[in-house]
Amino acid sequence: MHIYSVNDPEFKSYGNVWDDVPSELTSPVLEALSATPIPEGSKYVASAPELEGVKDADKLGFLMFGGRPFQLGWCNGHNTRLNCLEYHRASEFNLGARDFILLVAHRWEIEDGKLDTACVKAFCVPAGKVVEVFNTTLHYPPCMVDDGGFQVMVALPAGTNGPRPEAATDMPTAGDSYCYWKADKWVLCHADSPKAAEGGYVGLIGKNLDIACD
């Protein structure tokens, strides 16, 4: 599988690289992020006090979300497989303490509730780069560049990826409700993924990509 750089023109329809974010805004987050654990598998913390409490976190959040309430969390671990793809109603921002790889596709490539994994592209994100992932971009937990794993800040509007609301039991069957999973989280699963076994909507067809061997 070819791995592009987020600096390549191929990334432009998936997101933006914010090269001009002052280091005084990113360095405190990176220092705190570097101290978070890197487990086997992957772990996601939606709202992490150790990141949200650093100097000027409020300024970084305002820069990204323009005054909307936001959350700074992290996704760390070891992973090489696609498994699922998700999207939100707003952009997501990532910042890695280590290099990492994003597997992405476009929402408009979904046809009749299905997406062929042949559409998925891989992009390497250098450590220390702020990357905006558009709300029209399907994504999921990162993949690792090496055996050291990944440590990635995940910034989103507050409440995103939160518990599934009780109101979801009465959600109308319309639009993209078929793949709704949690608060502001819509997910397409591969049949071979753990989330599919939990009842997630199986919407990825084709190979469950693995960057270690594909």
Where in the sequence are the language-model features?
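Active-site region of the double-stranded beta-helix
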Residues: 1-127, 138-214
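Aromatic-residue-lined binding/catalytic grooves and analogous aromatic/hydrophobic interfacial grooves
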Residues: 133
